[in-house]
Amino acid sequence: MASSDVKLIGAWASPFVMRPRIALNLKSVPYEFLQETFGSKSELLLKSNPVHKKIPVLLHADKPVSESNIIVEYIDDTWSSSGPSILPSDPYDRAMARFWAAYIDEKWFVALRGFLKAGGEEEKKAVIAQLEEGNAFLEKAFIDCSKGKPFFNGDNIGYLDIALGCFLAWLRVTELAVSYKILDEAKTPSLSKWAENFCNDPAVKPVMPETAKLAEFAKKIFPKPQA
C-alpha cells in the first residue's frame, strides 16, 4: 500500500498523535504525516474532523477517522493480518484494556497535566497524591495484564501500552520542570521497567519526542504560574 493511501493529520508533540503513529509502525503501514502548526487549524483538519476540530485524524483512502484510541482500533482491525494484534483477543482482557485506557485519559493524564499548571504548594501536593494513587493502580494493572511479560499486552506492545506510553515523553518533561520523580522505581518497579522497554521498542523510538525539544515547547504552552 502506498503512503498516499494513508495520511495522518497531527503534530509531533501531541501524545494523542503518537498513538496512531505507533500503531501504524507496529503494523508496518507506510503513511504520510501531515503536521499541523501549533495554534492554528488547517482547512483539511476542519474538513476532516468538523465535530471536534482536533488532531489526530487518520485519512484512509480519503475517509477520515478521528479520536486517538478509535484510530488505533481501526488500524488494528484494518491491518489485522500485518504485525502483532494490538487489542487482546480475549473479550475480558480487551474490556480491561479499554477500561484502563479510559482511566488514563480521564484521570491520570489530567493529573499529570495539572502538575505543569499547579501554582502553590498545596495544589502541587494534591496533584502528587492523585498521581501516586494512579501510579499504584497502574502498577497493579500492569502486573495483572502482563502476566510476567514485558508489556501490558504480553510479549508485544498493545492497546494499553500505547494508551499510557504515549505520555512518557511528557512525563519526563514534567519531572524536569517540577523536580519531582513521578514514576519512581522504588514505588512502581514493574511500571518503571515497562516504561524503559516501551521507549526502546523499534515501533516507538522513531516517534518519541526528544526531551529537550519537548521541554522547550512546553515552556511556550505552559507558562509558569505567577506567584
Swiss-Prot record:
Listed GO biological process terms: de-etiolation; glutathione metabolic process; lateral root development; negative regulation of response to water deprivation; response to growth hormone; response to salt stress; toxin catabolic process
Source taxon at top rank: Eukaryota
A Pfam family recorded for this sequence: GST_C
SUPFAM superfamilies: GST C-terminal domain-like, Thioredoxin-like
E.C. number: 2.5.1.18
Catalytic activity: RX + glutathione = an S-substituted glutathione + a halide anion + H(+)
Residue span, GST C-terminal domain: 90-222
Coiled coil: none
Family annotation (PROSITE patterns): GST_CTER, GST_NTER
InterPro entries linked to this entry: Glutathione-S-Trfase_C-like, Glutathione-S-Trfase_C_sf, Glutathione_S-Trfase, Glutathione_S-Trfase_N, GST_C, GST_C_Tau, Omega/Tau-like, Thioredoxin-like_sf
Primary location recorded for the protein, binned into one broad class: cytoplasm
Subcellular location: Cytoplasm, Cytosol
Residue stretches making up the GST N-terminal domain: 4-83
Disulphide bridges: none
Membrane-traversing stretches: none
UniProt binding sites for glutathione: S14, P15, S40, K41, K54, I55, E67, S68
CDD domains: GST_C_Tau (cd03185), GST_N_Tau (cd03058)
Entry's Gene Ontology molecular function annotations: glutathione transferase activity
Phenotype of the disrupted gene, per the record: Delayed flowering, long-hypocotyl phenotype under low fluences of far-red light and insensitive to ABA-mediated inhibition of root elongation.
Cellular component GO terms held in the UniProt record: chloroplast; cytoplasm; cytosol
Keywords for the protein's UniProt record, in alphabetical order: Cytoplasm, Detoxification, Growth regulation, Stress response, Transferase
Family assignment from sequence similarity: Belongs to the GST superfamily. Tau family.
Role, per record: Involved in light signaling, mainly phyA-mediated photomorphogenesis and in the integration of various phytohormone signals to modulate various aspects of plant development by affecting glutathione pools. In vitro, possesses glutathione S-transferase activity toward 1-chloro-2,4-dinitrobenzene (CDNB) and benzyl isothiocyanate (BITC).
Identification of the protein by name: Glutathione S-transferase U17
UniProt source species: Arabidopsis thaliana (Mouse-ear cress)
Highest classification ranks of the organism: Eukaryota, Viridiplantae, Streptophyta, Embryophyta, Tracheophyta
Gene: GSTU17
